[in-house]
Amino acid sequence: MRLRNKPWAVKLVNDHPESVLQNPNPDEKIYWEKRFGNDHPIEIEVGSGKGHFITTLAEQHPEKNFVALELQTTAAGIILRTKLKKGLDNLQILRGDAADINCFFDKNTTDVIYLNFSDPWPKSRHEKRRLTYKSFLNKYQQVLKPEGHIEFKTDNSGLFAYSVQSMNNYGMFFDFVSVDLHHEKPEIVEKNIETEYEHKFAAKGNPIYALHAHFETK
C-alpha cells in the first residue's frame, strides 16, 4: 500500500547516505560489513512500510544486523526517522526493488527474510508480482544461508493459500503454519511483533495468517 507523500522525507533520506542506500546499481556489489561496521548476522524485511516491525526487531536484537528493503521514499524516511531517534546502528535502509534482492546480497549471507503483509496482487495476470511467486523464492534461496528461513504474515486468505501452494510446489519445508496467529499459544503470541497493518487488521477481528518455511539443504 502506497503511503501519502511526506515532503520532508526526501531531504531526510538524502541527508543520511550512511543509513540509506538509494537505488543501487544491481551490478555493483554492496559491502554490508562496511556499512554496518561488523559481520553480524543479517536479516531482511522485504517491504517494511512505516517500519514498526523492523525497528522493534533491531532494538530487541543489537547482536544482529537488519536491512529494511523498501521502494517508497516516504516509507524510507519514516523508518529512518525512527532509526535515528532510537540510535539503531544495526539497521540499514535499502531503497530498491525486491526483484533485485539477489543482486543486493551475496549468496548464502542472510539468516532470515521477512515478508509482512505484502501486496496480494489478486488478479491472475499479476501473479508474477507476488513476493511468494516462484521466481522470488528462487532469489530468496540464493541469498539465504542453508540454515536460513522465510517468515511470512498476511491478513489475506487468498495470498496465504497461494503462498503455501507456491512454497510447497517449490519443495520448501514448513516449520510453522497458523491460520489465526493471534490466538496461538501464549508463548507464540508474546514473541510476535506486530506491523502497523497487522495491528489494524487484528483490531477488526480479522485472522492473521503466518508461516515459517525453509528450503531443502543440499
UniProtKB/Swiss-Prot annotation:
Gene Ontology annotations for the cellular component aspect, listed alphabetically: tRNA methyltransferase complex
Cross-referenced Pfam families: Methyltransf_4
Top-rank taxon, per record: Bacteria
Pathway(s) annotated for this protein in UniProt: tRNA modification; N(7)-methylguanine-tRNA biosynthesis
Ligand binding (substrate): K123, D155, T195, E196, Y197, E198
Record region (Interaction with RNA): 125-130
CDD domains: AdoMet_MTases (cd02440)
EC number: 2.1.1.33
Active site: D119
Record-stated family: Belongs to the class I-like SAM-binding methyltransferase superfamily. TrmB family.
Protein name per Swiss-Prot or TrEMBL: tRNA (guanine-N(7)-)-methyltransferase
